[in-house]
C-alpha cells in the first residue's frame, strides 16, 4: 500500500489502486490523489452511482471527487465509467484522451461534451455500431384532438383531463394526412413537435397554447392526435472528434457518429467525423456522420466529414428549424441530405421543415453534393458549393427548394437538378461551371432561375416551365436554354425567358425546343434577351413533324451592330440597310419569323403620314451572305412625307 503520509484527517495517495483499496476512510477525511488523474475527494457512506472517474467504490463507502466545472475523460479508468457518468442529465465532460468506444454513449439534457486537441473517440463495430446518442422517445400514449386545428393556429384542444400538459411540456402531434412538401413516394404522414406555453380548461375542454403555429391542418377526419414525447434538451457538443485517419482497422465502421431523436436545442460545432468507407468507394457502411430525427432547433457549425458511407448531415422525421453552417464534406454520399422514411416496416410520420444550409462545401461526393429526398418544406441553401460530385451538384427532390448564391463545379450530371414530380426550385445568383449535362435542370416540373450563370455544360438550363430571368450563359455545347421534359408525363407550363445573355461564342444555339417530347413553343415568351452573334440560327428545333408556331418574342437582340439608326424619307419612303433577319420557309423543324422593327418619328412635317415597314430582304451573296446588306423599307401613307425616323431592330 502506497500511503505517503497520514496527518489525520488528511490522506494522500500516489496511485489510484492504493486509494480505492484503503480500508479505513472516515467521513471527515481530506483525501488527495496525486498524478494527472488526481484531485481531492470526500468519503461518504451514502449510496452513489460508481463511474470510476468522479465516484469510486471503496471499503465501507464511496469516494466523491471534488470539482467545479467539467469532468475530464483522463479521470476515468475505462469507457464504461464515462458512459455511466454521462447517463444522468446536467453533465459536462471534456474528452482529453483517446477513448475506445465499447458501447454507445448516451447524452442527456442540459449536458455538454467538449474535446481537446488530443481528445478522440474511436468506434468499435464489434460491440457498438453507434457512437454518440442524444435520444428521447415518441409518446407511448396518444389522445385525439377535441376539435380541428387549422394550419397557422397556435392552439389545440383535447378533452379535459386527457393530457397532462403544463407550460414547458413538449407535444407531438400527428395525423393520417400525408406530408405535402414533395412527391412523398412512401406515403409519410404529417407530424410536428411543439412546446406548451399555456393551458386553460373550460366546459370539459382543455385549450393548449403552442409556442409556434402549426404548418398543417390537423383535422379529426384525419385522426389527428397528440401525445407527450420524452425530449432531450439543451445539449452542446464542442469540437467532437470521432475516428482517426490512417488506420487499417476495418472494424471501425459505425452507422451514426452522432444520432439525435426527439431532441431540442442541440448544437454541434467545430467537429471532425471520419468514416471507414474506402476512398472513392460507394459502400454504405457508416450511414451518417450526424443524424437528426424528430429534432427541433438544431445547429451544426464548422464541422468536417470524411469518408462517410452515406450522409454528412442527415435530417428526417419532423425535424424543424435546423441550421447547418460552414461544414466541409469530402468523399461522402451527400454532404447534406433531407431524407425520406421508408414505410415498408410500418407507418412513418414527419418531414423536415425550415432547413437552412449556409457556407457549406461538398467535395467529390459519390452522389449529389446536396440532396433533398422526396419530402420537406421551406428548405434553403445559401452560399453552398459542390465540387466534382459523381451525380448532381445540388438535387432538389422536394418542392420549392431555394438556392441563393450557390455554386456547382464539374458535376457528372447537372450542376443543379430537380427530380420527378418536383415543382419549381428557385435559383438566385447561382453559378454552374463545367457540369456534364446542364447547369440548371428544371425539366421535371418547372423552376425559377434568376440572375444565374452556367458555363461549359451541354445545356445551360433544361426547363419545361417557370422563368429564366437575367443571368449569363456561355460555352454550352448544345444550347443555353433547352425547353424539354425529362419525364414524359410531366405537364409543360408557361415559360418566360427575359433579359438573359446568350451571346454566340462558337458553340450551341441560344434556345432549343424539344418537339420529340411534345414541347409547345407558344407556351414560351422571350423578351429582352441578348442573342448577339446567333443570327438566323438562334433556335434549334427537333422532333416536329409540322412547322410549329414560334414563341412570343419582344425586344430580343441578334446583333450588336446594324440595328439602330435614323432614316430620312424621300417622297414618303426610305430603304435602310440594317441587320434585319427572318426565316420565311415552312420546314418542320424551324420557325417562320422576321425581325421586329421599331419606328419612332423624329420630325413632324405637315406631310407626315402613318409609318409602316415593308419589303424586308436578306442578302444572298455566295458563298457567305453579308447581313450588313440586308434591308427593309420604311413607307409613309403620305407619298409627300419627308420625316426623319429613328429605327431599331429586334427579334
UniProtKB/Swiss-Prot annotation:
Start and end residues of each stretch annotated as Interaction with the host capsular trisaccharides: 71-559
| Source taxon at top rank | Viruses
Sorted alphabetically, which keywords does the UniProt record give?
Degradation of host capsule during virus entry, Degradation of host cell envelope components during virus entry, Host-virus interaction, Lyase, Viral attachment to host adhesion receptor, Viral attachment to host cell, Viral tail protein, Virion, Virus entry into host cell
A biological process (GO) of this protein is: symbiont entry into host cell via disruption of host cell glycocalyx
The record, for InterPro entries, names: K1-lyase_C, Pectin_lyas_fold, Pectin_lyase_fold/virulence
What EC number(s) does its UniProt record assign? 4.-.-.-
Q: Name one GO molecular function term.
A: lyase activity
Q: Give a GO cellular-component term.
A: virus tail
Site described as Important for the adsorption and infectivity of phage, positions?
472
Mutagenesis / variant outcome for changing residue 472 to A: 70% loss of enzymatic activity and 20% loss of adsorption efficiency
Query: Pfam families attached here?
Result: K1-lyase_C (PF24146), K1-lyase_N (PF24145), K1-lyase_Rider (PF24149)
Q: Describe what happens upon changing residue 334 to A.
A: Almost complete loss of enzymatic activity
Its top-level enzyme class, in one word, is lyase
User: Which residues does substrate bind?
Assistant: 130, 177, 217, 291, 314, 339-340, 378
Q: Does the keyword RNA-binding apply?
A: no
Q: What does this protein do?
A: Functions as a receptor binding protein (RBP) and mediates the attachment to the host capsular exopolysaccharides. Displays a lyase activity that specifically degrades the K1-type polysaccharides of Klebsiella pneumoniae capsule.
Q: Which family does it belong to?
A: Belongs to the K1-specific depolymerase family.
In its UniProt entry, what is this protein called? Depolymerase, capsule K1-specific
Species per Swiss-Prot/TrEMBL record? Klebsiella phage NTUH-K2044-K1-1
Amino acid at each position: 500500500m502506497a500511503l505517503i503520509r497520514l496527518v489525520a484527517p488528511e490522506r494522500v495517495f500516489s496511485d489510484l489502486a492504493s486509494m480505492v483499496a484503503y480500508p479505513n476512510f472516515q467521513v471527515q477525511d481530506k483525501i488527495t490523489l496525486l498524478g494527472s488523474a488526481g484531485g481531492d475527494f470526500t468519503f461518504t457512506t451514502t449510496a452513489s452511482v460508481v463511474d470510476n472517474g468522479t465516484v469510486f467504490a471503496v471499503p465501507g463507502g464511496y469516494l466523491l471527487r471534488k470539482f467545479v466545472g467539467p469532468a475530464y475523460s483522463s479521470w476515468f479508468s475505462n469507457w464504461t465509467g464515462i458512459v455511466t457518468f454521462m447517463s444522468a442529465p446536467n453533465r459536462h465532460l471534456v474528452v482529453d484522451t483517446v477513448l475506445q468506444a465499447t458501447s454507445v454513449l448516451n447524452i442527456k439534457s442540459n449536458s455538454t461534451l467538449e474535446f481537446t486537441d488530443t481528445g478522440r473517440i474511436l468506434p468499435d463495430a464489434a460491440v457498438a455500431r453507434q457512437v454518440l446518442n442524444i435520444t428521447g422517445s415518441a409518446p407511448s400514449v396518444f389522445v385525439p384532438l377535441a376539435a380541428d386545428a387549422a394550419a397557422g393556429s397556435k392552439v389545440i384542444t383535447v378533452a379535459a383531463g386527457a393530457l397532462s400538459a403544463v407550460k414547458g411540456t413538449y407535444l407531438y402531434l400527428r395525423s393520417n394526412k400525408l406530408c405535402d412538401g414533395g412527391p412523398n413516394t412512401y406515403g409519410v404522414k404529417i407530424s410536428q413537435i411543439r412546446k406548451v406555453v399555456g393551458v386553460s380548461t373550460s366546459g370539459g375542454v382543455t385549450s393548449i397554447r403552442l409556442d409556434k403555429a402549426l404548418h398543417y391542418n390537423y383535422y379529426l377526419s384525419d385522426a389527428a392526435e397528440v401525445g407527450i414525447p420524452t425530449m432531450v434538451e439543451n445539449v452542446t457538443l464542442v469540437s467532437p472528434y470521432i475516428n482517426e485517419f490512417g488506420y487499417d482497422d476495418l472494424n471501425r465502421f459505425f452507422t451514426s457518429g452522432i444520432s439525435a431523436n426527439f431532441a431540442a436545442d442541440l448544437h454541434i460545432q467545430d467537429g471532425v467525423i471520419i468514416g471507414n468507407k474506402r476512398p472513392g468507394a460507394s459502400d454504405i457502411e457508416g450511414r451518417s456522420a450526424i443524424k437528426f430525427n424528430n429534432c427541433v432547433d438544431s445547429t451544426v457549425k464548422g464541422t468536417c466529414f470524411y469518408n462517410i458511407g452515406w450522409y454528412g448531415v442527415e435530417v428526417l422525421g419532423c425535424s424543424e428549424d435546423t441550421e447547418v453552417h460552414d461544414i466541409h464534406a469530402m468523399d461522402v454520399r451527400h454532404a447534406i441530405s433531407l431524407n425520406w422514411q421508408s414505410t415498408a416496416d410500418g407507418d412513418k410520420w414527419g418531414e423536415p421543415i425550415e432547413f437552412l444550409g449556409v457556407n457549406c462545401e461538398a467535395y467529390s461526393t459519390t452522389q449529389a453534393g446536396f440532396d433533398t429526398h422526396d419530402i420537406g418544406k421551406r428548405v434553403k441553401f445559401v452560399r453552398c458549393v459542390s465540387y466534382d460530385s459523381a451525380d448532381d451538384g445540388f438535387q432538389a427532390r422536394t418542392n420549392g427548394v431555394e438556392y441563393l448564391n450557390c455554386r456547382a463545379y464539374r458535376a457528372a450530371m447537372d450542376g443543379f437538378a430537380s427530380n420527378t414530380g418536383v415543382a419549381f426550385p428557385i435559383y438566385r445568383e447561382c453559378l454552374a461551371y463545367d457540369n456534364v449535362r446542364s447547369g440548371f435542370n428544371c425539366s421535371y416540373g418547372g423552376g425559377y432561375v434568376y440572375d444565374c450563370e452556367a458555363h461549359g455544360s451541354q445545356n445551360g438550363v433544361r426547363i419545361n416551365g417557370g422563368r429564366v430571368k437575367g443571368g449569363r450563359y456561355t460555352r454550352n455545347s448544345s444550347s443555353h436554354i433547352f425547353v424539354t421534359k425529362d419525364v414524359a408525363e410531366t405537364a409543360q407550363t408557361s415559360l418566360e425567358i427575359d433579359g438573359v445573355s446568350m451571346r454566340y461564342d462558337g458553340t450551341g444555339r441560344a434556345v432549343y425546343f424539344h418537339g420529340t417530347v411534345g414541347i409547345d413553343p407558344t407556351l414560351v415568351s422571350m423578351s429582352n434577351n441578348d442573342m448577339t452573334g446567333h443570327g438566323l440560327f438562334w433556335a434549334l428545333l427537333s422532333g416536329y413533324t409540322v412547322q410549329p408556331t414560334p414563341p412570343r418574342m419582344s425586344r430580343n437582340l441578334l446583333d450588336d451592330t446594324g440595328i439602330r439608326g435614323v432614316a430620312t424619307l424621300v417622297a414618303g419612303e426610305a430603304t435602310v440597310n440594317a441587320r434585319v433577319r427572318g426565316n420565311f420557309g415552312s420546314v418542320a423543324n424551324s420557325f417562320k419569323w422576321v425581325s421586329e422593327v421599331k419606328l419612332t418619328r423624329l420630325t413632324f412635317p405637315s406631310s407626315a403620314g402613318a409609318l409602316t415597314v415593308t419589303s424586308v430582304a436578306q442578302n444572298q451573296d455566295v458563298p457567305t451572305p453579308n447581313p450588313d446588306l440586308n434591308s427593309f423599307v420604311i413607307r409613309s401613307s403620305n407619298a409627300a412625307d419627308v420625316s426623319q425616323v429613328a429605327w431599331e431592330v429586334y427579334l
